[in-house]
């Protein structure tokens, strides 16, 4: 019998983290948990660490260290806290690391995991959006296997087995269109956060649900795909597919189109990366084609979803613009969730920040963090200028 594969989950208490742990806990004979991390959710982190007999549990907020230590009392799990502890957890040398810390906060730990030269399952798309060049350079330098977790990128990965770019005519990234695909602009102006997080197909965290509603998520995914697959931007196409059954497609020069199809359950792409290059059984529902009455496709509406246009313009411009856009979007989404701005204001804040702040191309992680911080300051200040 082979040795259990050692695993670390960065962002263990979020939506992706929960799904990852669900699969690991169903297969504890095959996986040994090295470290689990969370931002502030002490209870879920401690419970998961004890259930999986993790070696270490790390809470990002250092003020919660004593709470975590108390929650782990009586177990063999080590407690640690703070930003440096997150990076240390990523560097503990697990065979497989899930990078699922939301936003730019996960950048440093994700890069640390990549530098260990093992396998990294990437669910933190913001890492590639803000620091794509640096990330891909590190993957190449350290011989790391980088596996995409986002359903669309995982689908492309599965449909692109030999990664021979010369054979590809186009890559089609599908989008559900979110909860407001057919909603008028007038109605979108009044939607609440509670309504906006209700995705029609996927179960996701609040931030990514809002990104899906604005279609910024699809823009971020386009940038991520551009870095992951190193395909010219003009070969990518976004296609709205409301049923979320086809997760993405690759068309080859001979006219063949390979599509990855399945029920909308994140445990499928997570399971693919967890077992890769093998396969594992997951509890995802098997697709019943006899009940699939139709599959619809339509072009995205760039006028009603300007965030998608902003993302496309950012990657075309390159440099620091994707990092600025990502930071401004995180600030705007947080403000919307706090009911400080309206839904349509999210894209306005991002656009204003891009207009006001044009830094030089980052050449180091420190540059990325400086750009990210300044973009957040600018976005927060620009929110004050919005009409009441």
From Swiss-Prot:
Activity sensitivity to pH: Optimum pH is 7-8.
Domain of life: Bacteria
Catalytic activity: 2-C-methyl-D-erythritol 4-phosphate + NADP(+) = 1-deoxy-D-xylulose 5-phosphate + NADPH + H(+)
Pathway: Isoprenoid biosynthesis; isopentenyl diphosphate biosynthesis via DXP pathway; isopentenyl diphosphate from 1-deoxy-D-xylulose 5-phosphate: step 1/6
Positions bound to 1-deoxy-D-xylulose 5-phosphate: 125, 151-152, 176, 199, 212, 217-218, 221
HAMAP family linked to this entry: DXP_reductoisom
Name of the protein described by the UniProt record: 1-deoxy-D-xylulose 5-phosphate reductoisomerase
Organism annotation: Zymomonas mobilis subsp. mobilis (strain ATCC 31821 / ZM4 / CP4)
Lineage: Bacteria, Pseudomonadati, Pseudomonadota, Alphaproteobacteria, Sphingomonadales
